[in-house]
A protein has these predicted regions:
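Positively charged, low-complexity terminal tracts
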Residues: 1-145
């Protein structure tokens, strides 16, 4: 079977209530660096929220073997990020602190994961983050077209 590199990602960024942006980024290194930059900015924004739990999941819908899940605990400052990485049923769980080293580690995991996604033939990506109880909550949404 022929391997297909992801052509582009459509990003929906909901930074505040009633503020939405839609940007297309290509599946090159600049595109992924841009996505990671948005994630970093979003994480900093989450630090200002005092009450909600956040889950960020990044997975290929047609292949559930590769999934990254980040759980942000409900504290004013982010205490830890729980990371579960399931790659072909090899599940690893990490607790990492919300400091610059953690973001570098998170970035490396995402970059590795993106490389895995390139192996999918017809992968649909859904990058979804936000607060479950409030539809107007901040969030970053990525859909592969």
């Amino acid at each position: 079977m022929e391997k297909k590199i992801l052509n582009n990602l459509k990003m929906f960024y909901h930074a505040k209530s009633y503020l939405k942006g839609k940007i297309e980024v290509f599946s090159d290194i600049e595109g992924y660096n841009y996505i990671i930059k948005c994630i970093e900015e979003y994480v900093l924004m989450l630090k200002n929220n005092l009450s909600a739990k956040y889950t960020i999941s990044f997975k290929g819908k047609c292949n559930n073997k590769s999934t990254l899940n980040f759980l942000f605990k409900d504290k004013g400052e982010l205490d830890t990020i729980s990371l579960t990485y399931d790659k072909t049923h090899n599940i690893e769980t990490f607790n990492i602190y919300a400091n610059i080293e953690s973001y570098k580690f998170l970035k490396e995991c995402l970059e590795d994961f993106v490389e895995d996604l390139k192996e999918f033939i017809h992968a649909e990506l859904n990058f979804d983050s936000g607060i479950n109880v409030d539809c107007d909550s901040p969030g970053i949404y990525f859909y592969h077209l």
